[in-house]
């Protein structure tokens, strides 16, 4: 057994990177039609999932770090034709179905949000991890707990994306 302590920043980054690799692999080569595929009228499409996952990472890492969200600061909201405060939390099935963003813009934001989130997390201090922040439910909790939730959501959503890809492409798409 080693005495090396696990660095929380590196651990969170490893989880974020794993889900980003999964969603990148699962979306590679998909058409616009496939990105918008919904198995039922009340399920999330891949395009919406990758956007929402990225918005949530950007919003939470910005809150914890005290930096502005790139969604607004870098004009992604405007390019996507959406309000700056929209994250996908609470979107209705109709909003999910209506979600359409040009592929290059969507994946431009997805990549930018991933990279800025990793950068922010790499620079967080122990004090920032224990600071209380208000969650989307209104609950005050330490930033590390919210970060754990973001990692869990990222894993769930990247898994949903991979599942949808499998539904469309069948066995062997990951080769």
Pin down the residues of each PLM region:
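Basic/polar N-terminal segments that are highly enriched at the extreme N-terminus
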Residues: 1-10
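Acidic/histidine-rich alpha-helical segments that form the ligand environment
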Residues: 83-131, 148-150
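Hydrophobic alpha-helical core bundles mediating ligand binding, dimerization, or RNAP-core interactions
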Residues: 16, 20, 27, 110, ...
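Short, contiguous alpha-helical
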Residues: 9, 13-24, 34-89, 132-175
